């Protein structure tokens, strides 16, 4: 892999890689090996015409959120916010994560259950949108800003200070997100 400062190559190199995978009709899924900052720098330059004719899965999380939201809002294409190959060998990443991802990629229903930290007596359902809160926040006001009306907004973040999270959530609330 090439490097360019904090990036996995120059913007044009990374754009060429994602474009090649997007255009190739033999590629049925793109598994991002890691999050890595920089997708938001190129996401609006990806030519999505081939993808609209031949949809495929894009899988990843963290900074890949910008790609997920762009695909969803601009193309109406679903993607999968899921574990990346870099983490498959991590003992904290159970085989269940991988198996569930494969089921989702095959089109099988994958129910999501969650035990809230306190007792709750309600059931929710709806379209799920979201991802890394820093990326959601940075895409506010762009064509990739998620539609949250009637949706279940999920957010993830690692190591962010509470006051940063509060600032982002407050801004998102004030802008109607």
Segments and roles (model prediction):
Residues 144-177:
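Internal helical hairpin/lid segments
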Residues 46-70, 78-85:
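Short, acidic/small-residue loops that bind anionic groups at enzyme active sites
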